[in-house]
Amino acid sequence: MKELQELDRQRFLRHHATMPMQLRAASEGDAGTIYRFILDLARYEKEPDAVHTSESVLRRQLGLERPPFGCIIAEWDSIPCGFALYFYNYSTWRGSSGIYLEDLYVAPEFRGRQIGQSLLRKLASLTLDRGGHRLEWSVLDWNKPAIRFYEQLGAEPLNDWTTWRLTGSALEKLVEEK
């Protein structure tokens, strides 16, 4: 029985290893897919109620002449299976741009197929193509699978830096103060 299970597993892996994985830039028509991925990621990160965007907002922003973000969609056998949403940043010290990865997500049933690595490879290529020098992102300290994945790629944490954020009433209060 174990031999049969192993044979089935090998057939499955051979079949799926030959399936085409493609990466492409997102368009307005991908807004629903991106939104679903954002919701899935928020649930995984234990923040399902923190999402305040919508499919229509994403569609509108993707349709702008200069969208506020870029997004790469991964497809496996023409099925959307993951995404990387990013924007460009700039280092005054280096005098060059980079990419900040806002979200990286691969649907659970597609994990283990190097899709996440392919998405990051594409972003690294975009960074270098623009003369940039770094690709950076944040990861929740409890997300050990993601941390291991990033370490395997050669990424290193910026332990001396802490992310700070102004939102909501604190942001508004700062604007109103003179």
Feature map (PLM): residue ranges:
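Conserved GNAT-fold acetyl-CoA-binding loop/helix
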Residues: 35-61
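A short, internal acetyl-CoA/4′-phosphopantetheine-binding micro-motif in the GNAT/acyltransferase core
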Residues: 104-111
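A short beta-loop-alpha structural element at the N-terminal edge
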Residues: 22-36
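Conserved beta-strand-loop-alpha-helix junction that forms the acyl-donor binding cleft
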Residues: 137-146, 165-169
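Conserved beta-strand in the GNAT
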Residues: 71-73, 79-87
